[in-house]
Regions:
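Cytochrome P450 heme-thiolate monooxygenase catalytic core
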Residues: 161, 266-268, 324
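Acidic/polar loop patches that form or flank catalytic/metal-binding clefts of enzymes
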Residues: 160, 259-263, 299-302
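Short, highly charged C-terminal tails/helix-capping segments
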Residues: 265-278
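Flexible helix-coil linker/hinge segments at domain or subdomain boundaries
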Residues: 253-267
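Short amphipathic alpha-helical segments with heptad-repeat character
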Residues: 138-142, 146, 237, 241, ...
Length: 369
């Protein structure tokens, strides 16, 4: 049995007179006596359902006006163009079904008119996700991954899926989650790095993975998460310049895709998305230290890692996405390839966000073995 023919965002005033079926949540009900308005919310927005007593009949009207907020409802009705309605149309219902009545009082207010504590949100997470701003974030995340997968596919990069239960660390053993694996100790994987390198040796040439990573580290900062979705890329027969070109095109393409396809979600979040210009700037580590000293008075020794304040300053000064290149070999992983004529400098780089004070991507050419 079909319970929905359209989402609210698919309906317009041009469909005047057309019968539709909507399904979603009772977001709000305004009772004005002989007429009432039910605002139905689905994942694409909201639709105004106009309840007229003389058209619905006494019993149906009484039932409809008593629907509790956040109940799951199905509405069959006809579209009517109405300039005063929020989206330029209203639905005159011929049938209303309550598929699941919400218990009252609600644990939180999905209309966001009443704020609530984080603990309350997490205790009733399914209700919290109903909030338009939270749902918009999920939809934008989906759009970003869709754009990246499409770009990688066009570049001939193969998507792979590597094990998430491993016997040993891939990047040091201090930040692994241990688990029991059939009476043996195993760990949740913190990176697919070793598997990607194995696939390079197997001749797959270009691979990527989008999947979860797990790190047992302090998580009370914006730089650390115990669980996250990681986008990992590995390319053979290429140098650092080739990889930077792939990354900047992929990132700028994702921005552009979201700007074009997630306008409603961005509006819900009150965000204006600026698509970064190509190519991204290349700033050497040495030049970054000079900028920090010239304009912020920061004094750092060559070979020091950049701290949060320096990265924040650089982002504000440069004002756009940029690559931080030519790092000291001593502060990059051992497998990072150094320049032959300057072994103290390596061919590793970070893709930096101008306002988040952190790297979007950390990459390098691998040492030849």
């Amino acid at each position: 049995m079909i319970l929905r023919t359209h989402y609210s965002g698919q309906i317009s005033a041009d469909m005047d007179g057309k019968e539709v079926m909507l399904a979603g949540f009772a977001h709000e009900i305004r009772d004005l006596g002989g007429i009432a308005f039910l605002v139905l919310r689905d994942r694409e927005g909201m639709a105004q359902i106009t309840l007229v007593k003389k058209l619905l009949g006494k019993d149906v009207f009484k039932m409809a006006r008593s629907i509790s907020r956040e109940s799951v409802v199905m509405v069959r009705g006809n579209v009517k163009a109405e300039a005063k309605a929020p989206r330029g149309y209203e639905i005159l219902p011929t049938e209303i079904q309550v598929l699941s009545a919400a218990q009252v009082p609600l644990p939180l207010d999905p209309t966001e008119k009443v704020e609530c504590e984080l603990d309350t949100r997490l205790d009733s997470r399914f209700m919290d996700i109903r909030r338009p701003c939270v749902l918009a974030a999920f939809e934008i995340e989906s759009a970003v991954l869709c754009s990246l997968r499409d770009y990688f596919h066009k570049k001939g990069i193969v998507e792979v899926f590597t094990p998430k239960i491993v016997a040993a660390a891939t990047e040091g053993g201090t930040d692994l989650f241990p688990i029991s694996y059939f009476e043996k100790e195993a760990f949740l994987n913190q990176s697919p790095q070793l598997y990607k390198q194995m696939l390079m040796g197997a001749g797959m040439d270009r691979v990527y993975e989008i999947g979860p990573i797990f790190r047992a580290e302090e998580h009370d900062t914006r730089r650390h998460l115990n669980e996250a979705i990681s986008i990992d890329l590995e390319v053979s027969f290429a140098d650092d310049k080739d990889v930077m070109e792939i990354l900047e095109e992929a990132v700028a393409g994702a921005y552009s895709y979201v700007a074009d396809n997630c306008r409603r979600q961005l509006e819900v979040l009150n965000m204006e998305l600026e698509v970064p210009r190509l190519p991204f700037k290349r700033i050497t580590y040495t030049r970054a230290l000079e900028l920090a000293e010239e304009k912020a008075g920061a004094r750092m020794q060559w070979g020091d890692d950049l701290d949060t304040e320096t990265e924040r300053f650089l982002g504000e000064s440069i004002g756009e996405h940029y690559f931080l290149i030519d790092w000291p070999s001593s502060i990059k992983p051992y497998y990072t390839l150094p320049y032959e004529d300057k072994p103290e400098i390596c061919r590793g780089f970070d893709l930096m966000h101008p306002r988040m004070e952190l790297e979007i991507e950390r990459a390098s050419c691998r040492e030849r073995v």
